[in-house]
From Swiss-Prot:
The lineage of its organism: Eukaryota, Metazoa, Chordata, Craniata, Vertebrata. This is Patr class I histocompatibility antigen, A-2 alpha chain. Glycans are attached at N110. It comes from Pan troglodytes. Disulfide bonds join C125-C188, C227-C283. Residues 25-308 are extracellular. Residues 299-308 are annotated as: Connecting peptide. Heterodimer of an alpha chain and a beta chain (beta-2-microglobulin).
Amino acid sequence: MAVMPPRTLLLLLSGALALTQTWAGSHSMRYFFTSVSRPGRGEPRFIAVGYVDDTQFVRFDSDAASQRMEPRAPWIEQEGPEYWDEETRSAKAHSQTDRVDLGTLRGYYNQSEDGSHTIQIMYGCDVGSDGRFLRGYRQDAYDGKDYIALNEDLRSWTAADMAAQITKRKWEAAHAAEQRRAYLEGTCVEWLRRYLENGKETLQRTDPPKTHMTHHPISDHEATLRCWALGFYPAEITLTWQRDGEDQTQDTELVETRPAGDGTFQKWAAVVVPSGEEQRYTCHVQHEGLPKPLTLRWEPSSQPTIPIVGIIAGLVLLGAVITGAVVAAVMWRRKSSDRKGGSYTQAASSDSAQGSDVSLTACKV
């Protein structure tokens, strides 16, 4: 009988331990890859980031001096040198696959060599509160538009256009969906359980939102009421407005949840109301960190507990340090969040140095 390598055994044991535990709600692991061609300026730039829930834990940038996958969360730093070697090797392999794919896709779309083009990939898995597999994802985009996605059954593909049909036929012939499914239901889940255990103080915490309301006159007849939620984790939150108890969904301006730069999140929802009728409107906040939903109503004497200028300044500073390509990837992720996708990687093997995003022999587009 073959002897199981120590690292693989450790991963399996951590997975078995995780199945004896329960967590609040579901959890996810996601990888986001972005490749941007730079005609006349050398190789495409490749950026890879990994997230567990809403926390970034690894990052690779082909333009960085280190040329290594780097930790972005304290709990991942405990992984040994073999882990980082494998994660780096996988990222570099993906970058080379994307370099070839950028040229192939340019040909599919009959594009010249002069312009810059972008490939974006998202893949990952979700587990339930019992640590068992819920769903997997794989989505690809080209130049900011959907290209091909693994369907919810993890057995078939949806192609967005005629060019993507070519890729679909290639991947079907190579049985790519079966390989992705094996990774998503196996290795992805095992590593996610391990990360949730190792990073439980961060990943399994709940920080309730700090809430307040602001009032912004528009004219003599109208004003904007804005309901703020700040400093919360995890990112999932619900803000709703009601007028005399009736939902005002259609009339609500709602921004996407934004990172605050300190590991927590921010969000606001606003409605335009007739002057003098502010008391008829209530904001309702639901979050995992709250024992029960909060209800806020504008009081003329109420003041924001956190200056709005400070919030805006924080968001501007955050934006200055985020790479444009990663922002594009996250924006595309949110745009595509209602669809199911999948993976670019493989199931657990006997490779003792295996990482959580170990790559397959790549299926090119």
